[in-house]
């Protein structure tokens, strides 16, 4: 699943505590990432030792997973707010595995470098077609020609006519 790539990217940059904000129906995420002793025992007992790494990959050893239920789906900001007790005052990354990007240097490592330099909130954005704008949060940039772009506002899933730009989060 795409979320696997997001988790592996986080682990690759040194993140060792991961919070999943899910609805109560999303048991599959917890089932996917939690160590499952029952399955491991069953695989050992049936001579399928080679399958254990696929079920409980060692990449997750030392990683702490938190699962927080968001009862009412009130947007991304509300989802992040639900993690406040786990995050505290520490810097954090929000990974949205809706899209997958391939690059020589991971998107998250680039964001962390910019954060460490600017000591400010950093967003990864991507230019999208007008026909897809209604699917994304879209930024209203202060100055589209600056680098990095300063964001004045984010409009959640606007129509193409209401979108302040064609740059999505």
Predicted feature descriptions by range:
Residues 14-16, 88, 117, 150:
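Short loop/turn motifs at secondary-structure junctions
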Residues 12, 34, 78, 98-99, ...:
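Acidic side chains
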Residues 27, 102, 159-162:
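Short, acidic Gly/Pro/Ser/Thr-rich loop/turn segments
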Residues 2-6, 78-82, 153:
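Well-ordered alpha-helical segments embedded in enzymatic catalytic cores
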Residues 1-48, 65, 106-110:
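N-terminal glycine-rich phosphate-binding loop and ensuing alpha1 helix
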Residues 112-116, 143-169:
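Catalytic-core segments of class I nucleotidyltransferases/pyrophosphorylases
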